[in-house]
Amino acid sequence: MDDIAPGMDWKKFADFKALLDEYGIKPLIGVVPDNQDRNLERTEENGKDGREHMPEDFWEYVKGLQERGWIIAMHGYRHVYTQKKGGVFPLNLFSEFAGLPLAEQLAMLEKGRSVLDSHGIKTDIFMAPAHSYDRNTLKALRQAGFGRITDGFGSKPYLWKQMCFYPISFRLGSSLKKNHGITTMVVHVNTVNRKDMENYRRIFREYETISYGDYLQTEAVKRGWAGHGVEYLLAVGKRILVKFL
């Protein structure tokens, strides 16, 4: 689940959480440490319906989810796109991190981690806003104590640049039809609609599911430059297809 922030659409979050609870699924959630992205501020625009589901203390609520087995990733720092770069996984040509100097990226990561630490939330997993990061991001992540990142394409975790990647699905429909491997899907909780909910319910009902904590126990395989080259081209291709569809 993406874009978890204090002002998100709490009604939609509550509805999706209820669906996850029904099927016993404990997901990974990407938490923005210091959200400055107005697009993620949805509580007020949803009025009373949104505020009724909003917890009194956001950070205590997130910490409680972690204690109950939900996996927390740090989703960027402020979720503000200042760079027109796609980095080494160019699904998008905008970024909070890719294109910035190493020292600046490291400072952002350390500030984000400090926010999480101050609320008792520990994680070494990073989720890049817009899926965009570059080699400096990976260096900065290692220096800041992050060893895992939720991105890339594949059917199992892989090792590259001294980081462990937990890939997303290139094309969910095709991934679900495969009889091997594990696929993950990205849920933008602020934009989930009724049709989406029906589709997620169908997926949970028809396919075998596991919690993200179980996925983290999957043995990672090594990936070299050739594998990364294919992944890069797939990301470019998907970006172009999405643009024209």
Regions found by a protein language model. Name each.
Residues 80-92:
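Short, flexible, mixed-charge acidic loops at enzyme active sites
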Residues 13-17, 59-63, 109-113, 138, ...:
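Generic structural signal for well-ordered alpha-helices
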Residues 13-14, 53-62, 154-175:
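Alpha-helical scaffolding within the catalytic cores
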Residues 1-68, 115:
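Active-site beta->alpha N-cap acidic-glycine motif
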Residues 33, 76-82:
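Short glycine-enriched loops at secondary-structure junctions
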Residues 96-171, 193-197:
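Catalytic domains of cell-wall/extracellular-matrix polysaccharide-remodeling enzymes
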Residues 27-29, 72-75, 123-126, 148-151, ...:
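Hydrophobic faces of well-ordered beta-strands that scaffold small-molecule active sites
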Residues 24-31, 149, 191-245:
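C-terminal domain-boundary segment and adjacent tail
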